[in-house]
């Protein structure tokens, strides 16, 4: 694979060349040169790569995997993203926004912790694309000012995933 970095701090994602492969001007995007296709949106990319590699997406368990993957795409990511906007990037500009998204963020941590009480990973005991999609949001726990210590199961999950060689390599890209 080849990595092309898009500098979102310089608005490179809004350039016409990039918008042709990502109409919403969002990262990530992949191009599969073997099949001559490009894909945008994390969930679509993860499903595509998992099906292509036959890893992290057990077809017999895809219903539960999809449920947690889409939960991340529709709820966890957007809500933690809003928390980042109000709490990390623009503190002091909206007390309502900061308080609202802090509470939602805390609730997400609690909900994930409860789920992980009953299973090693989000979709039972297999590491899947649902975990891959959710992990980067929890990896920003220092931005959330909640702390992982009071969430025993979420902490275990986070520590397990953060010690994986491929995850370490991915964060170093």
Residue ranges and their predicted role:
Residues 5-8, 61, 128, 153, ...:
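Proline- and acidic/polar-enriched loop/turn elements at helix boundaries
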Residues 68, 72-166, 170:
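GST-like fold's C-terminal all-alpha helical module
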